[in-house]
Amino acid sequence: MSEIVNCLIIGSGPAGFTAAIYAARANLSPVLYEGVLPGGQLTTTAEIENFPGYPDGVSGSDMMEDLRKQAARFGTDIRFGIVTEADLKGDLKRVVVDGEKEVLAKTVIIATGASARYLGLPDEAKYAGEGVSACATCDGFFYRKKTVAVVGGGDTACADALYLAGLCKKVYLVVRKPFLRASKIMQERTLNHENIEVLFEHEVVGLDGDNGVAGASLLIRRGQPDEAAGHIDIDGLFLAIGHQPNTKVFAGQVDLDAEGYIKTENGSPLTNLPGVFAAGDVADPVYRQAITAAASGCKAALEAERFLLTME
């Protein structure tokens, strides 16, 4: 016989654990499945200094462990497992964990996050948290007065380059195309900044360094009859080539936008399906901060509580 739970939370980042804290305190007896990366993306961040309550900063893994303990303290049933199937359209939502265990839920909070798109280099995993980052506002502070590179050509890449230019000695903006895709004003600010050097028609194809990133190998197309090799000395590499929301298992059920993010109603966690709520980066293509994810997790739990009251 399948297990039936009041509130099923899928994902264990700031959104998922905050939802769990609020749901547990409301006596909803939440069950949380941690997913592929327990603790979410923040576990790969060396230090967080912009989350309230940590005046001396905290490592991403330590902060997520604090949130996990707090959720467990109030009675959240935290389980390791990956949701591999989902049918969310009925009164009881059905999910399958790890391809075998079936769980039925009266409410579901989707907090599966969004994964940064990476370049696919063999060395990226090696340098994760040691010089490769997908969040300039999270990690840029640690590269003060150093040299870094940003990969990308859109608004996010330009914004990251401008942000880092205020901290770093030098910023390379590595762009595959011969032009920027960013808005005109962002292009102007980026191209005119004295600390930013834009490398058009360049592509990062390798990383090197014994203790963290020390350099990047480049493939150069600009001004070359054939592709040429190049190299830049850098202390960090920031990726700004987009994020991929982790919504594949929910496609065809919850409404998604063109990029795959879950559509919600007017800034709330409400989705198109009654009893199904979305929180954190999985529904946020704009801010993608730990504090905004936590706030949306709180809202999702409150909405789940209200929904369950209407079912009584």
Predicted regions located by residue number:
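A Rossmann-like FAD-binding core segment of flavoenzymes
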Residues: A71-V97, E102-A105, G166-N266, R306-E312
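Phosphate-coordination loops involved in phosphoryl transfer and adenosine-cofactor binding
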Residues: I4-N6, F80, R144-K146, E201, ...
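An active-site-proximal "capping" alpha-helix that borders the catalytic cofactor pocket
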Residues: T292-L308
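Beta1-alpha1 glycine-rich phosphate/pyrophosphate-binding loop at the start
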Residues: E3-F74, T147, G152, C158-K184, ...
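Glycine/small-residue-rich loop that forms an oxyanion/phosphate-binding "nest" at active or ligand-binding sites
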Residues: I78-R144
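FAD-site-proximal beta/loop scaffold in flavoenzymes
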Residues: G120, K126-F142, I241-Y287, S296, ...
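Short amphipathic alpha-helical segments
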Residues: A20-I21, T44, G120-D123, A161-Y163, ...
